[in-house]
């Protein structure tokens, strides 16, 4: 992975690198590989993530169609 350093601005280059790594999912991968995950645990986690994604997609779809209101912050 490469990042251009312009005008000796290392801070800006570091921010760009972090953003690229975040987009690629490297931080998440490092966190996951920090300890061994049993195959059964991996399957359970992936299934839970898929359910979460499906619910989020259904919620967004319903909101877009006007079935439910958006998040307003008021309770």
Swiss-Prot record:
The UniProt entry, under InterPro entries, shows: Ribosomal_bS21 (IPR001911), Ribosomal_bS21_CS (IPR018278), Ribosomal_bS21_sf (IPR038380)
What's a GO biological-process term for it? translation
Q: Does the keyword Ribonucleoprotein apply?
A: yes
Q: Which domain of life is it from?
A: Bacteria
Q: Which Pfam families match?
A: Ribosomal_S21 (PF01165)
Q: Write the record's keywords in alphabetical order, separated by commas.
A: Ribonucleoprotein, Ribosomal protein
MF terms from GO for this chain are: structural constituent of ribosome
Q: Name one GO cellular component term.
A: ribosome
HAMAP family recorded for this chain? Ribosomal_bS21
Q: Which family does it belong to?
A: Belongs to the bacterial ribosomal protein bS21 family.
- The name this protein carries in UniProt is Small ribosomal subunit protein bS21
What is the scientific name of the source organism? Brucella canis (strain ATCC 23365 / NCTC 10854 / RM-666)
């Amino acid at each position: 992975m490469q990042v251009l350093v312009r005008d000796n601005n290392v801070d800006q280059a570091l921010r760009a690198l972090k953003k690229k790594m975040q987009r690629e999912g490297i931080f998440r991968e490092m966190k996951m590989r920090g300890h061994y995950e049993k195959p059964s645990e991996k399957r359970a986690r992936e299934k839970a993530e898929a359910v979460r994604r499906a619910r989020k997609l259904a919620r967004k779809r319903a909101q877009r169609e006007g079935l439910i209101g958006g998040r307003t912050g008021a309770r």
